[in-house]
Amino acid sequence: MPRIHVLPPGLVNQIAAGEVVERPASIVKELVENALDAGATSVGVDVEEGGLALVRVADDGSGMDRDDALLALERHATSKLRDAEGLAAIGTMGFRGEAVPAIASVSRFRLDTSAGEDGAGTRVEIEGGVLGEVAPVARPRGTTVEVRDLFFNTPARRKFMRAASTEAGHVSEAVIRLALARPDVGFTLRSAGRLVLGARAGGGLADRAGQALGREAHRHLLPVDARRGEVRVHGLICSPDHSEATGRALYLFVNGRYVRDRAAAHAVLRAFAGTLPPGRHPAGVLFVELPLHRVDVNVHPQKLEVRFAEGREVFDALFHTVAGALRTAPWLRARPQPGDGVPAGNGGGPAPVPVAGEEAAEVLAWARAARPPEGSGATLVQPAPGAWATGRLAFPVAPAPGAGPEAGPRPEGYFAALRYVGQHARTYLLCEAPGGTLVVIDQHASHERMLFHRLREAFRARRIPVQPFLLPQVVTLPPAAARALEAGLAELGRLGFDAEPFGGEAFAVKGAPAALAGVDLTALLTDLGSQLAEVERGSAVDDAFHDLLATMACHAAVRANQDVSPEEARALLDGLDAIDFKARCPHGRPVVFELSLADLERRVGRR
């Protein structure tokens, strides 16, 4: 049996390099983080052949004297940590003292550094972990590290590297993440002598985000900033008018450190629920700040993952901060508010959208309370007189006798300022905006969004207005949907349905949400049963309620190829200004299309 023995230091460093040095981008990350920890105000990165031939990182930080320069090459030697208490509340980017010796063990490594203002510095050279020349060198205060011929002594590692262009892309992404975290520091990145990134110090987060996300995304950035308990979330998020095919354009930072956290990313995606088409993802730059002792950064070799003491608190802070910003921000792109005379976002400050609670109160005011079904959070009501329209559009119309569609005061807002022209193809509402812009509104998508908003807010208040039936309505469902619905009767009650099994695949429905008057209950309950079958019991069901409510709103909304009176159209337009996320239906489809007068005139040859 082989005897146990202690590995030589060089081999230990190469093993450590297997965790720390995944690719050239890992080296860039570690060296730039060291520069930032040293107080650098300017960092320059140069790479050749994607970093395989050369990685050079130069900074103007505090630098090191000769003794510290040599000590920095020893494993577990660091200036950033002294005891266990410090590890529990680490605030620097690096702290383990592993990266530099690990990098030096798999490359031809040179370190030039100076800690004084006299121009005297130190040069240390290492080849494959073996110390070479240590000599004085003239240089200004700061540090320059050159890493050449990465993995020259570990060919098995080098053969797993991708093409130089691929590795250069990873290096660029690493520098972008670091530049986003520190807008106060200047960054340059050159690849094969070509300037890839130039970010001046103090330009602001919006400029950095524009460089990272692109010019189109920059036009849609919204500021977010809120605190919940000890957690603050701030940064910039793109409105739903701009989305990405993957989640890579969402940059999340915890106490200044870029992290990959699936729960945090999911919280942001949840905040966008119903505003993005399926398969699309939000983009933005978000910072989470919380006390250092409440987050453990020592759980991943490259510190890309963290562990929170209270993960739910961080999830809630992200969700509510982003959702609140989307709810109140004027993200109907370049759409003027009445009385402003300027596009939203260009000054003048459009009126804020009413908060969710106000809308919920309006919904609940439509109905008078009665006996709640046993075991549910819903409230049985009779619809208030005039509360519902003709059975097609479930929102208040009730104009004064003889009043036309333009009569009476209306709420201020984008939709209220539109002049209703008429209905096209019994599907689209045609309107004229101030300035002559043609506005086309999808009647189903817009009504669906309004119904969804009201159902959701009433659901959150646990008081969905419910219409009891004089006689139970018996519906028969497909077997799979019936089984799922029977298992999910409690969830069905929370949605405002009073139903019970009636033998086989049949259910006796004694009441349903008042907003769904006239809906085909068989079709609706079949869809709800199918959705319930796809989720597990417990917390996952809460995540699914958005989709369930969206399905209910879709079934109840006015359809395409259905007549809408001018009064109903006017009431719909006025009502849209009082809800959030009005630019898209709950499934993410656009509600509004605009054609400016200038574009129209160009189309017909007037310009």
Curated annotation (Swiss-Prot):
UniProt entry keywords in alphabetical sequence: DNA damage, DNA repair
Organism: Anaeromyxobacter dehalogenans (strain 2CP-1 / ATCC BAA-258)
Function: This protein is involved in the repair of mismatches in DNA. It is required for dam-dependent methyl-directed DNA mismatch repair. May act as a 'molecular matchmaker', a protein that promotes the formation of a stable complex between two or more DNA-binding proteins in an ATP-dependent manner without itself being part of a final effector complex.
Cellular component terms (Gene Ontology): mismatch repair complex
Nuclease keyword on record: no
Family matches, as InterPro entries: DNA_mismatch_repair_MutL, DNA_mismatch_S5_2-like, HATPase_C_sf, MutL/Mlh/PMS, MutL/Mlh/Pms-like, MutL_C, MutL_C_dimsub, MutL_C_regsub
Name the record gives this protein: DNA mismatch repair protein MutL
Family to which the UniProt record says this protein belongs: Belongs to the DNA mismatch repair MutL/HexB family.
The keyword Membrane appears for this protein: no
GO BP terms: mismatch repair
UniProt cross-references to SMART domains, sorted A to Z: DNA_mis_repair (SM01340), MutL_C (SM00853)
Gene Ontology molecular function, alphabetical: ATP binding; ATP hydrolysis activity; ATP-dependent DNA damage sensor activity; mismatched DNA binding
